[in-house]
Amino acid sequence: TFTTLVTFGGAFFASFPLFYSTSFGGAFYVWMAILLVFVIQAVAYEYRRKPGNVFGEKTFNVFLMINGIAGPLLLGTAVGTLFTGANFTVDRLNLANGAGSGSATVISQWTTPWHGLEALTDVSNVFLGIAVTFLAATLACQYFMNNIDDKTILERARQRMIPAAVCFVLFFVAWLGMLLFADGRAVDAAGRISIEPYKYLHNFIEMPYLAVVLLLGVVAVLWSIGLGWRGRRNAIWFGGAGTVLTVLALLLCAGWNDTAYYPSLADMQSSLTIYNSSSSLFTLKVMSIVSLLIPFVAAYIWYAWRAMNRKPITREEIRGDDHQY
């Protein structure tokens, strides 16, 4: 997950540098909190069973629990701001005003002292964060069912998957309902941004292929839950694929069809769109060429995971001191 987050940030930096500077530079409290919980996860995995560690194994287990809850909760909340908006302003005149002054030029500024943590006060953001947390728990249980060769652990994972999956479905459906009936920010041909009621619902209606992708993703996740409930080991493949399709459809809905993908709550005209925040044409062309390698990278990832998971993990390997992650 941490590697995916870093890749996500790097891709956004290259393609949408203004979003990168605005979100990562303005909402840095929430991004630093996300970074911290993943750092303590890595430290916990490395040292929890090292002989002579001064904190003890239970302390590192608490670190893992913090990461398992706070990590996806904060990530989901941060992603939710792509639809609900954030408190920032953008003033491109600072580029001209700062030219030749010898000082750093800042064109986007955060308007609250909480620097992103205020997203936790929005019900829609929190619902998405909770849904992501329970989805992570559901997929984790499905992964254990598929990759651990132990009947006791398989049954325990199946039993724990069911309540997590039910909670995920409830919170995700509630969040999706709020999204479809929420106001969005639309951009016209002149670049002016205005509020459009039911904007995201209109996006799915006007782009039915996105609605189909979203439906396929949701059905795949629900199918994986049904398979997991019956104790099928292959549930994770449907759950993982369905999650990717669902996230893809939602992110495209946030930015396509003349939609501001990062609305500003402080100044509507500062909202970020694909048109006003993308990188140079040359950079986008280079990234388009490089993106042709994505199918090969995806195939390699599939092959590598398939090779690692070909032999199920045993209880003895889990109890061992060697690296098993």
Task: Provide a role label for each language-model segment.
Residues 237-246:
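Central hydrophobic cores of alpha-helical transmembrane segments
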